[in-house]
Amino acid sequence: MLRLEWVRRLQTITQAGLTYTRDAYDRQRYEQLQELAAEIAESFAPVTSTASQLGATGSQLGATSESWLDLIRAEKGYATPKVDVRGVVERDGKLLFMREAHDGLWSLPGGWADIGESPSQIAEREVLEETGFVVKASKLLAVYDKARHAHPPEFWYCYKMFVRCELHGGAPARSIETLDTSFFGVNELPPLSQPRVTEAQVRRMFEHLAHPDLPTDFD
C-alpha cells in the first residue's frame, strides 16, 4: 500500500522536525504537515474501518475515538521503529500458539515491547499472560524488519524479535487477548494471524529448533 508508505514518511519527517525545531513558524508548518498526512490517510484508510488489515493492535488503530491525526501526533521525539517480541516455546517437537481474540486466528504469543523490560522479560511475560505457561527465555532466534516480510501493510515501522523460551510449568489459560492455546507441529499449522506472524517465519522457527546451533537471523 504505497499511499500508506507516503503517510509514514511524512509522519517521520514531521515528528523529527517538531522534536528539533526551535522556531515557532517551523513548528506551525510541521503541524500543518501532520494535518495533511492525516487527511491523506483518512482519504483511503478510515481509521475505524481498517485497523485489522493494517496490522494494528490495541490502541494503535482500533479505538473508535481516535483519528489519524491523533495517532500521528501521539508519537513524540525522534521517530524509531517499534519492537514486537514473540516467544518460541517448544514441547514434544511442537510450538505453542495462541488464538487471537482480535481476529480469531493463531499466532506465536507476544506483543509490543514495553519500556523498562528486556526482550527476554517481555517474551516470558507475554507467554505467561497470553497462554498461562511459565517459560524462561534462552536465546534470541531472529530479528526481522517487518516490512521485508509478507505481513499486511502497517502504519508503524516495526522490528520483530523471536525469542526461544524453555517451558518450565503452568497450564493453558485464556485472557482478554486469547481465545485458546495449543501446540502445533510443522505439518499441522493453524490459520495464522498474518499481521503477527507469517508461515515462513514459523517454519524458520521450527528449523531453529531442529538445529539449535544456527546463529541468530537478522535482516
Language-model segments: residues:
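Short, solvent-exposed positions on alpha-helices
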Residues: 24-28, 154
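Acidic, metal-coordinating catalytic segment for phosphate/diphosphate chemistry
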Residues: 31-53, 58-86
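Long amphipathic alpha-helical segments
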Residues: 1-25, 38
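Unchanged
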Residues: 113-137, 145-205, 210, 214-219
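Short, hydrophobic-biased amphipathic alpha-helical segments
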Residues: 6, 29, 197-201
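Extended, positively charged loop/linker patches that create polyanion-binding surfaces
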Residues: 109-111
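N-terminal strand-loop-strand
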Residues: 50, 69-107, 135, 139
